[in-house]
Amino acid sequence: LNQQLSSLADNLLSAGCIKFGSFTLKSGLISPIYIDLRHIISHPKLLSQVAESYQLLITNLQFTRIAGLPYAAIPIATAISLQGNYPMIYPRKETKTYGTKADIEGEYHAGETVLIIDDLATTGGSKFEAIEKLTSAGLIVKDIVVLIDRQSGAKESLGQAGYNLHAVLTIADLLNYWEENGKIEKDKIEETKLFLQNSR
């Protein structure tokens, strides 16, 4: 990892965004690692650093506006929007039953290319739901950018459907960096690598 990403990896760890221990996942599996990037919003300097790390990835991508996915990525997308002066929208998790009954909040025009911003990629399921809402509104999606790719199949499943997943960091990047620099005990790293390998 370069200096900027090493600093980001350290700050994510110290902010409690990534924890090691024993955690029950939604699927019922017991995981030795837990990634909760919602903590980022409580650390303004970290939020700014996270937004900067996305900026470096998205400068070469073609898009008209960004779409933050609810809920964790909306503040991240807002920070990116402010830093890069990109117009932003977001697809709602649930359709509004009153007022405009909108599926998508913010201004947009059919035919525009939208860059999806999310916090984490696991299998890609939630990305496909968002893509469906955006494309149903006449928007074009080519690229999805996340902070961390858990490397659990999202890149492959999105790729097969014709979408490009870009990640600031992969789980392998983080584990290798923390192991090499003695930030996390070796046995915890090994246990986590084994778990991630087996749960793919």
Language-model regions: role of each:
Residues L1-I58:
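Active-site-facing substrate-recognition patch
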Residues T64, E112, K142:
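Conserved acidic residues
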Residues Y54-T64, I131-A137:
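Phosphate/pyrophosphate-binding loops at sites that engage ATP/ADP/AMP, CoA/4′-phosphopantetheine
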